[in-house]
């Protein structure tokens, strides 16, 4: 019985279903007489005081700035593992998904920009349709079971990891606010300490987490988005240490320890906190405005065109090969699934339009619609192309 529960918790489809439940619950609460309770819950003030340190934020921002930093720490651990010991460890393995991921970022961004070039504030959301929600996309793919070659699952995972790496770079370069020099100096000191600990082969996970918290606080205060602290911490934790004849794999241990927390608490809570859209506040003209249309078309059309188009071109030019035992139509189906932006797109949306409340409902609904269309069409294509 215990084994079955553990297996269920590690199934991608279980994670996807939980995210759907969290989203539907948020939509129900926001559009019911309980909407005031939902809104007040998200805006509950939470303060932390420790000596001179004082951080006060509503619960929603603790989720977006705090818990999502833990999520990006987990993503950073995944990226490091794949680079050192996995699907990104060899150029030949990462060429095809990297090219496809590049297309999956460039084409949706250009499509969004083409619809919003006239409005500088609206144009700030160009990165929203470039994201892929790996948990949700793999969840849809897992519904097809063994009918899909394992190589396609590996491709989608690798593409999403490269996509996440791109999202991290985008956040660092384009969604950084006014900088605080003092906080950046403190963050630099924390990074230096982590680097020294790495070189000295420190094996205490608690020590890394303690310095990591200091790094997160300083980055939070610096104007750089706090989630980047999670990535930096992950990359500075030693992958494998051989000490006194004993092997310590800190990265794998931490990644394994965070798996359930990230997928069954952090991501569902993020979806619950950010997917609540008041449908009564959205008119059809607003839904078909340039920003929502840029997001919907970017996710559903731009993403599949970019991933499939760049991938197909790479195959035709003999730069890369299709995943083993997969067909071109199956690759197209997976390219469509890459348009499930969901939590990652909602997160970038919260950064792009945090001061522009005019978009805050229609753009979120656009993320949900674009992701839903990508999930449904991707599933149909793959089920038809992989009929038993």
UniProtKB/Swiss-Prot annotation:
Keywords: Antiport, Cell inner membrane, Cell membrane, Ion transport, Membrane, Sodium, Sodium transport, Transmembrane, Transmembrane helix, Transport
Catalytic activity reported: Na(+)(in) + 2 H(+)(out) = Na(+)(out) + 2 H(+)(in)
GO molecular function: sodium:proton antiporter activity
GO terms classed as biological process: regulation of pH
InterPro entries assigned: Na/H_antiporter_dom_sf, NhaA
Membrane-related topology note: Multi-pass membrane protein
Localization per Swiss-Prot or TrEMBL: Cell inner membrane
Residue ranges of the TM segments: 14-34, 59-79, 95-115, 125-145, 154-174, 177-197, 200-220, 222-242, 257-277, 295-315, 328-348, 362-382
Predominant localisation class: membrane
Entry GO CC: plasma membrane
Family membership noted in the UniProt record: Belongs to the NhaA Na(+)/H(+) (TC 2.A.33) antiporter family.
Summary of the function given for this chain in its UniProt record: Na(+)/H(+) antiporter that extrudes sodium in exchange for external protons.
NCBIfam families: NhaA, PRK09560.1, PRK09561.1
Protein name: Na(+)/H(+) antiporter NhaA
Species the sequence originates in: Nitratiruptor sp. (strain SB155-2)
């Amino acid at each position: 019985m215990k084994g079955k529960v553990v297996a269920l918790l590690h199934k991608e489809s279980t994670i996807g279903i939980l995210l759907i439940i969290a989203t539907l619950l948020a939509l129900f609460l926001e559009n019911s007489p309980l909407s005031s309770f939902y809104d007040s819950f998200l805006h509950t003030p939470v303060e932390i005081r420790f000596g001179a340190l004082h951080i006060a934020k509503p619960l929603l921002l603790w989720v977006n700035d705090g818990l999502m930093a833990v999520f990006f720490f987990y993503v950073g651990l995944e990226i490091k593992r794949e680079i050192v010991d996995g699907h990104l460890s060899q150029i030949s393995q990462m060429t095809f998904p990297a090219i496809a991921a590049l297309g999956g970022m460039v084409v949706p961004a250009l499509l969004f920009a083409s619809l919003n070039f006239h409005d500088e504030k609206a144009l700030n959301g160009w990165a929203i349709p470039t994201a892929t929600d790996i948990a949700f996309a793999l969840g849809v793919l897992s519904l097809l079971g063994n009918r899909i070659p394992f190589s396609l699952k590996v491709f989608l995972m690798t593409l999403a990891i490269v996509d996440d790496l791109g999202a991290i770079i985008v956040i660092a370069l384009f969604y950084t606010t006014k900088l605080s020099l003092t906080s950046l100096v403190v963050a630099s000191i924390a990074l230096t300490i982590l680097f020294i600990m790495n070189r000295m082969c420190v094996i205490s996970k608690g020590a890394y987490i303690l310095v990591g918290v200091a790094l997160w606080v300083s980055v939070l205060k610096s104007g750089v988005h706090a989630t980047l602290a999670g990535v930096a911490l992950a990359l500075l934790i030693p992958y494998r240490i051989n000490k006194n004849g004993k092997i310590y794999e800190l990265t794998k241990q931490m990644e394994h320890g965070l798996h359930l927390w990230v997928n069954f608490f952090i991501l569902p809570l993020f979806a619950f906190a950010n997917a609540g859209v008041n449908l009564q506040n959205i008119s059809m003209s607003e839904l078909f405005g340039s920003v929502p249309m840029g997001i919907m078309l970017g996710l559903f059309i731009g993403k599949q065109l970019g991933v499939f188009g760049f991938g197909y071109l790479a195959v035709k030019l003999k730069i890369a090969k299709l995943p083993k035992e997969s067909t071109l139509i199956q690759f197209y189906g997976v390219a469509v699934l890459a348009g499930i932006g969901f939590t990652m797109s909602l997160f970038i949306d919260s950064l792009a339009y945090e001061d522009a409340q005019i978009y805050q409902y229609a753009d979120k609904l656009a993320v949900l619609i674009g992701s839903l269309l990508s999930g449904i069409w991707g599933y149909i294509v793959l089920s038809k192309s992989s009929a038993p």
